[in-house]
Amino acid sequence: IGMIRYGSQHLTGRDLEFLKDLPVSMTVQNDGMPDLMMCHGSPRNLSEKILPGHVENKEIFADVAPKYILCGHTHRVANFTQYGKTVWNSGSVGCPLNGKSKAEFMILHSKDKQWEVEFVTLDYDVEAVIKEMREKSFYETAPFWTQVSEQLLRGGTVAHGTALNRAMELCQMKYGECKWPMIPEECWEQACAEIFTEK
């Protein structure tokens, strides 16, 4: 709930309209180059993951015309071909799940009317980012999301999804039901305490 609260405090009505109007996926065309399908999760769902080797990819790719798919959501670099599609995931600039405290991105180069992908990792001032998170009151607004983010920035490997899943399990056990994003902070707190104690 905390990051939703933070977002609602900082996004304008115009920002929200812009986000609402964005398509789930879009095809990008460049003269003389193969088309690119761009999406956050998958071409059909913002929250769906495209993972190497998953049989579900056959169904995900069924209605996708372009050969190349650029996606994100997993916070992990990916470069694979399956069911006639090549998938590139740039990883994450802010919270990569690489355990290395490095920003990740990719550059697409055109060469002989084909795409060549270059994956890049860069060092950056992680402590400055964490300091800014504290200055902007992230710990007050979204303490447990921020706790997970900080350990990722410092090279940890516990994903937000891991904490979210455990918090939802605890919410379900305590209240009989759990609907995202309405997860009580006490469940987040217990989930993070368990996860980081195990580490």
What do the predicted segments below correspond to?
Residues 1-28, 33-35, 45, 51-65:
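Active-site neighborhood of divalent metal-dependent phosphoester bond hydrolases
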Residues 22-25, 74, 92-95:
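Glycine-rich, charged/polar anion/phosphate-binding loops
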Residues 25-28, 77-81, 104-108:
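Short beta-strand scaffold segments in enzyme catalytic cores
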Residues 29, 39, 118-120:
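Beta-strand residues in well-ordered beta-sheet regions across diverse protein folds
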Residues 39, 68-75, 87-91:
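Active-site neighborhood of phospho(di)ester-bond hydrolases with catalytic His/Asp-centered motifs
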Residues 44-46, 70-81, 95-100:
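Active-site environment of divalent metal-dependent phosphoester hydrolases
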Residues 67-68, 116:
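Short active-site oxyanion
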Residues 83-90, 94-199:
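Acidic, His/Gly-rich catalytic cores of divalent-metal-dependent hydrolytic chemistry
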